[in-house]
Amino acid sequence: MKGNYLVIDKRVLPDVYEKVVFAQKLLKDGKVKEITEATKIAGISRSVYYKYKDYIFDFAETSQGKKVTFNLIVKDQTGVLSGVINYISEQGGNILTINQGIPINGVANISVTIDMSTLIGDIKTLLNGLSDIQYVEKIEFVAME
């Protein structure tokens, strides 16, 4: 594996990391032209920005053109798998592998790997949309290449 990476929910990290990403976004979107201005708006020092700017990235921005694997826990209801497949297709996802386990105690596990290079949105949007499908109980991110 190239690099030493972790996927961490931002809720458990100090606010400074999210502020660095916010400053990066201000600069990228052209809302500010100077790093000094971006750091002031974000509420961080320039030294903090420079310390972390090359190591912190928004998950959605780094996810294009890659493969992602996630698991879904779904209720044993007719059409749930079809709904999941249709939604991924509507969002431009290319399903590489899909595996549904035998339902036990009224729920089944679905494991999906997709190529995200053709997604209309980002991975967060896709996973949020999948969680809105009726009878999808839980989604768990497994890995990203």
Curated annotation (Swiss-Prot):
This is UPF0735 ACT domain-containing protein CLH_2637. Residues 69-144 form the ACT domain. It holds the Pfam family ACT_4. NCBIfam families: PRK04435.1. Belongs to the UPF0735 family. InterPro entries: ACT-like_dom_sf, ACT_dom, UPF0735_ACT_dom-cont.
